[in-house]
Amino acid sequence: MAQKQKCVAMLLAGGKGSRLSALTKNLAKPAVPFGGKYRIIDFTLSNCANSGIETVGILTQYQPLELHNYIGIGNAWDLDRVSGGVTVLPPYAESSGVKWYTGTASAIYQNLNYLSQYEPEYVLILSGDHIYKMDYSKMLDYHIEKEADVSISVIEVPWDEASRFGIMNTNEEMEIVEFEEKPQFPRSNLASMGIYIFNWAILKEYLEMDARNPESSNDFGKDVLPLLLDEGKKLMAYPFEGYWKDVGTVKSLWEANMDLLRDETSLNLNDRNWRIYSVNPNEPPQYIAEKAKVEESLINEGCVIEGDVKHSVLFQGVTVEEGSMVIDSVVMPGAKIGKNVVIERAIVGSEMVIEDGTIIRPEKNVDDVVLIAEGK
């Protein structure tokens, strides 16, 4: 029997991320590079480490190899523990055959045995594909204080975007009275962040109930949470007011990277009290040539800059040759940009080679973002 844990986290990291197009052709969405040196999953794992959550199950499925290699034993996030720590949980074969995760609830249900060994009081369920910094221990304190069966972290979103999210309708005490999954006409703009805290006994009971229902899609938002409400369980909304970004599209991923370059951003990566940890790429120092010009940009290790870079994010090992300009763009690891190239409002994928004289910018709508990646 493993050492008993008060709270165990389950991190859903098996998403395909099809709206990210070629960026996720051979890569799980949580492993997509972000912010010059990170992967998207670094934010959730760092939040766990900084919040004192020492046991994290990571549920993977789509294109898991690079993500598994990146996570390793969790030492980058101080989650390599004798008891607990990080455990990668892909789908596995039973006597009846391999069971793929068919939904968010299905993924947790198939790993109830993993949770049971820790006898937790509470289970924290997380998504591995959002950019944010959050102290989960404060949410747990709130959950306990409110004597909730389930607590759901919520954030106010613009009304014109509310139909893209699971929306919570609450009373004055922030108790959830109705949950609507992507409503056409939302009555609230409190959106679910995909962060849940369940009392362990409630989670186990309702996942087993959901698994027995042949009509269920095995999804928390569509099936489990509405059932809990119908049966009178106490669901509380936990309001979050910090930076949070769903980076599920090429444009939203680009926007989140650009947010890092603002003078006053609520996503501060320089906060030594809440570090975002990542795997060290072990690259040499970046080199900026005499005639190069760099403004308002994040330039990571191993970059060689001979041209101009303005308001852009460059990952490790990027080369920008003489006469080239990179403006308002994200250039992912190992990309090579030749001479006299112009790149504007674009994401350049990992290891891409941009030939001399190429011009890359939105052709029709100046507000668009161009993606240049393998498979495009």
UniProtKB/Swiss-Prot annotation:
Keyword field: ATP-binding, Carbohydrate metabolism, Glycogen biosynthesis, Glycogen metabolism, Nucleotide-binding, Nucleotidyltransferase, Transferase
Coiled-coil boundaries: none
Pfam families: Hexapep_GlmU, NTP_transferase
InterPro entries in the record: ADP-Glc_PPase, ADP_Glu_pyroP_CS, GlgC_bac, GlmU/GlgC-like_hexapep, NTP_transferase_dom, Nucleotide-diphossugar_trans, Trimer_LpxA-like_sf
EC number from the UniProt entry: 2.7.7.27
Pathway where it operates: Glycan biosynthesis; glycogen biosynthesis
Catalytic activity, as annotated: alpha-D-glucose 1-phosphate + ATP + H(+) = ADP-alpha-D-glucose + diphosphate
Record flagged with keyword Lyase: no
Recorded superkingdom: Bacteria
GO BP of this protein: glycogen biosynthetic process
Binding locations of alpha-D-glucose 1-phosphate: 101, 166, 181-182, 192
GO molecular function: ATP binding; glucose-1-phosphate adenylyltransferase activity
The UniProt record lists the keyword Nucleotidyltransferase: yes
Family named by the database record: Belongs to the bacterial/plant glucose-1-phosphate adenylyltransferase family.
Subunit structure: Homotetramer.
Role: Involved in the biosynthesis of ADP-glucose, a building block required for the elongation reactions to produce glycogen. Catalyzes the reaction between ATP and alpha-D-glucose 1-phosphate (G1P) to produce pyrophosphate and ADP-Glc.
Protein name, as recorded: Glucose-1-phosphate adenylyltransferase
Species lineage: Bacteria, Bacillati, Bacillota, Bacilli, Bacillales
Protein encoded by which gene: glgC
